[in-house]
Amino acid sequence: PIFGITNTHKDFAWLPQALESLISAEMWYPMITATVGHTYRQIVNKYYDLTCDDNVPRRRALGNFDFRGDMGVDAALKASAGWLLSFVNTATVPAIPFMKEMYNCDYSTEEVGFGAVSTEHFVMCSNSAIDIVNNPDDTYEYKDIDPMRERVFLKRLLTELYPNTSFSCVCDSYDYWNVVKNILPTLKDEILTHNGC
């Protein structure tokens, strides 16, 4: 157990269990996300040491995007606060003032958390339709909305929209493994020359 409360008075034998339940319910979720974040940070540190030859801040290596899928605003704030102990990228922007309140962070002078440039499923899916409408004479071989059409938008993200900043990209709108195995290898040059963080 993470903590224990011992009863010291026979008339209050019920109190420790009640308090333990309340405290555990409030602490468990942020502790889990803090532990996961810390574990991921150890992995990031290890592989940055082995593979990176630049000064990219390790605290910016990963981000959490759980706000929309969490169990409510309170849960999202606590989960993101746990994550922000190891990394600074979050889609749960309200967690930044929460960190100030709970951890006495001064986000005017220190890196507490940042929102990240990122795509969403809707953006990735609708871009194919927009691309087809805007380019009716396109000679691209995939004329219909097709998973391979994601390549067009991924290239645009890398070379036109965000050529000088890092961004997060949803890659599972159609077929995640198609993106990893087939699309990203064709964009190797664009990825390697991209001027992200």
Show which residues each predicted segment covers.
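Buried, small/hydrophobic-residue-enriched core segments of structured protein domains
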Residues: 3-197
